[in-house]
């Protein structure tokens, strides 16, 4: 062993079939052995594990969970839209704000004007809040460039962030986020650019794991999204979708049928769509931050998702317009208070189910032999406190590939 963690209380998130427990209950006085960045032992204290003089970390009866995974973010952008926040509070509708040059296209303009270095430093600063909440893996999307060069610029920033030693990154191409101004009323031609030029070039440069789309009346049609998905799959990329946020176009069922790892937002998802998620083992990613920030009233179909046993992930959806919230624990609380998830569902949503939403369920999101050694060590007594209490610095340290990172 390279490193052994002793005197810890474990919340493994490993399911009943594998352990006989539910993975959420606290198992006291556990030892974890790590070698080459992976978990090699989990169980009762075992003196033989200490042979070879590994580095011993006494957790002093702290609570240990899998490292948190924020599986849906728009972390990279320039500018901010605080002025729009004020306008919305005054009752000005989004459509009017957009006509005045606001909305997503204002972020596109600012992001296009920013250099790669500027975007990198802005994103690294934003990461700090997520780190304090125990995040060890983050998904980051492009989507504020909307040209070949600017989408690649954003994805190069994602790649630079992935080189940080204390954060793992999953990269998503979201060129189909909005129709850029130069393609106004020519969205099919913009889809041509995405499929014929942007996706092949991103694959050539190895800059993305997934391709995402915004399937909505104000975004792209199911026919257009299907074409993007087919192109992505043909080039060996995984797929996911922003679907059923504002209306029910059938984007979730389409994405699931094509093998999507997750569909996200899903406030308007119906039973047909839920059945499609079950059939194709697609994760439903809930984004309560956007629901809260936009003062929406249409709740996701939580009862149906439970009935059909669809895994539910939750994420910050961190972005400048509709969820400028860099706190995954705040989002966990919102998932409970706004969407009526239980604290257990909330914790699964940022660990094992979030890993599945990124296609990483065999590597992260649980603490078990063979998994990557990504943990969060908390000064807490029970896992329910993670959703219950906000603003208190409960995190002692994050562990990424077995390396320890103490938070400021």
Curated annotation (Swiss-Prot):
Enzyme class: hydrolase
Residues holding N-formimidoyl-L-glutamate: 144, 319, 321
Listed Pfam families: Amidohydro_1 (PF01979)
Amino acids binding Zn(2+): 72, 74, 242, 317
Record-listed Fe(3+) binding positions: 72, 74, 242, 317
Reaction equation(s) it catalyzes: 4-imidazolone-5-propanoate + H2O = N-formimidoyl-L-glutamate
E.C. number(s) listed in UniProt: 3.5.2.7
Record GO biological process: L-histidine catabolic process to glutamate and formamide; L-histidine catabolic process to glutamate and formate
Metabolic or biological pathway, per its Swiss-Prot or TrEMBL entry: Amino-acid degradation; L-histidine degradation into L-glutamate; N-formimidoyl-L-glutamate from L-histidine: step 3/3
Stated role: Catalyzes the hydrolytic cleavage of the carbon-nitrogen bond in imidazolone-5-propanoate to yield N-formimidoyl-L-glutamate. It is the third step in the universal histidine degradation pathway.
Protein name as it appears in the record: Imidazolonepropionase
Species annotation: Aliivibrio fischeri (strain MJ11)
Gene: hutI
